[in-house]
Amino acid sequence: MVALKTQGYWTRNWLIWLILSILLIVFIVQSINIHSIQTQKGSIIEKAGSQALRQVSEKAIRGDILDRNGEILATSLLRAKINIDPTILQKEFISDLAKALEFSETEFKDLMDSQLSKKRGRRYWIIKDDISLNSQMIGDIESLITDRRKVCAEMIVDKKLKLHHRILSKIGVQEYPNEKIKVNRCTKQKLAGVKIEKYTQRYYPRGASLAPLIGRLNSDGDGIAGIEQEFNDLLKGKDGEKEISTSSDSGSYFNPKVVTKKQNGKNIQLTIDANIQFMAYDAIKNSVKRHDADSGSAIILSPNGEILSMANYPADNPNDKSTYIPENYKNRILTDLLEPGSTMKPFTMLLALDQGKITATEDECFDVTKRIGHVIPTYNDKKIYKCMTVKKILQKSDNLGTVNVMEKLDKETVYETWSNLGFGKSLALIPSIETPGVLKLPYEWSNADKRTASFGYGPMNTNLAQLARAYLVFGNEGSMPRLKLFQNFNKFDEDNVKVFKRETVSNIANHLKAVVENGSGYRAKMRGHEVAGKTGTVDVRLASGGYSKKGNVNTYFSGFSPVENPKYFMSINLNKPKKCFRGYTNKPFKCEGSNSAAIAFNEAMNKILNNGNYDLQLAGN
């Protein structure tokens, strides 16, 4: 009985120890699992912490600039650049990535090695830029970025302990040192180290021909010249803001919430005709080069004051971002002040005829042999011209004859008329760059001022746009409309300013036709088209107040076509032309409006009138 009891005792004792051991093992395993779960939970919490809310800017798209027919003159193109970080680029993608980027695999690897050898403060560098979003390259790169591939890498990790070793290590029975081993680990991965950065790029389809008028942007996307600068806020719009949740691991974002809605920029439509603009630009460019002038400008108007062209040369191509010369973005038609010279003589005749001081007929002749003040006879041989009619005075552009007419007028009336023609007043087209010129008050005029005012010197100066506008009286029965540059804003409903009688402008217009047919403006004459206009030549005024004695001049031609019911008005200025010729010969001659600016007028107007594609739809017509 005792033996049996002893045997049963040890059996039970062994069973108890076995059960306790099993419970201990279960406890240890559960402890390990709990620790693992806590570790994973900590990782999840850490990842959740890395997913943060942040606000990002949503760029507004800049508005377009259009011509009168809707042709785009300035627009923002969606472009892309591809950035690469060679430190994390997987070798499994290199072959296809090189192909997508249009490199050979060897070229691409050499580029990567070159970048890796450089000590750089930034990880990513631009490998391709200025790419269309619709290009094959962008499509191929986007496919690679979303593709998952098997990527294997040799890694050194801790050798995994067996379960009973882990248990014994946990309960402190025996320590097992960490052993490092090499393993080849493979995972499915997306392409790393490649980013597509999208942006907008301003594009000017007509290049340099419109640059001084349209302007350009700086690297921050703000206008730094022309209309781009003047109306920067209107064109730029307002950026929006979105609140997004981001993951610091992948950089991905989700659940975007609009905080501030973006407002894209407004479009601006001009009265400019892009084709007429190009013809005027081409003509003025040719003239500047032909006559070795410092610069040249041309403005073309419709009868109702719409500006069809504002051309300046030299001018740069705004699509070329490598250079920026501010002088080549200068809209001289509005910025440069000039003394208009003999282009003012028609207005002296208009005023005198309108006031009944002259008849402007063939039997009315003015003495051009006697000096008046500081104005001396042009022709020393008195047998050539003892007197001149109004037509002859305009044809020969005679200063003394014009002064004879001005002597019949009082300076208050002259001032009032010049003011009604817009001289000395802002055109309010692009206010920040316009220099409106000066018209002195009549009490400041001396007798000499009044005389020189008759031929565009003395108490006044102006810009080319104001001069061109004054000639609109010949297309509006003596009235003068406001100039218009914008189709979709800055509308003015005011009546035209009445300056002269209808009969007066018709009479003098025919005399200006004679100037082109048989006078100083003969180089503006065109086969098949009637032209009327007036030349001008002015000594360059120095900053000191005097005039250049080196023969430097500014030359002009202002005119219109046809003579009855004119369709186009154009004013031309060449600044300091140095290479001119006598008549139609190759003999060098001093530069005048007749042998420089009149030629530019002819070239531009000929192209426009003979193109045959223009039937202008004028505002209000």
Stretches found by the model and what they are:
Residues 1-233, 315, 423-424:
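Membrane-proximal periplasmic segments of bacterial cell-envelope enzymes
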Residues 61, 209, 221, 226-250, ...:
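Short, Φ-rich (hydrophobic/aromatic) sequence segments
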Residues 61-62, 78-82, 123, 192, ...:
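Envelope-exposed proteins and targeting segments
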Residues 492, 591-621:
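Short, gly/Ser/Thr-rich active-site loops of penicillin-recognizing serine hydrolases
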